[in-house]
UniProtKB/Swiss-Prot annotation:
Associated pathway: Amino-acid biosynthesis; L-cysteine biosynthesis
Protein name: CysO-cysteine peptidase
Pfam families: Prok-JAB (PF14464)
E.C. code: 3.13.1.6
Catalytic reaction list: [CysO sulfur-carrier protein]-Gly-NH-CH2-C(O)-S-L-Cys + H2O = [CysO sulfur-carrier protein]-C-terminal Gly-Gly + L-cysteine + H(+)
Keyword field contains Magnesium: no
Organism encoding this protein: Mycobacterium tuberculosis (strain ATCC 25618 / H37Rv)
Gene3D superfamilies: Cytidine Deaminase, domain 2
Binding site for Zn(2+): 88, 90, 101
Amino acid sequence: MLLRKGTVYVLVIRADLVNAMVAHARRDHPDEACGVLAGPEGSDRPERHIPMTNAERSPTFYRLDSGEQLKVWRAMEDADEVPVVIYHSHTATEAYPSRTDVKLATEPDAHYVLVSTRDPHRHELRSYRIVDGAVTEEPVNVVEQY
């Protein structure tokens, strides 16, 4: 999907999935956490939380473990799912994609969610579309159920 000028995208996501991403980010802090929310192909609805391993084990960089990523992507394909959300945390900065994050963004249909855990008492969660190096922030609508 190509983003058209003037198109507004919104991430609609269940609260339990937000809580799962934040818990994963807190658990892995001070290292960056990363993972995927899978959903039925064509639905744009995240349904299943898949926490993944940060192969870098770093507070300033993340990289999905390539072997684990291959297994997860194959399992999603077998289940007719796609990566609706690809997320990771920033441990000392705001929830905004770095230049490296933008370079690593290879799924044009995914919502890229960043969770900042720099404040131990609250989190910051923001969502973006990243296509061909262009970063567009989108609203996040947290719901109890779809």
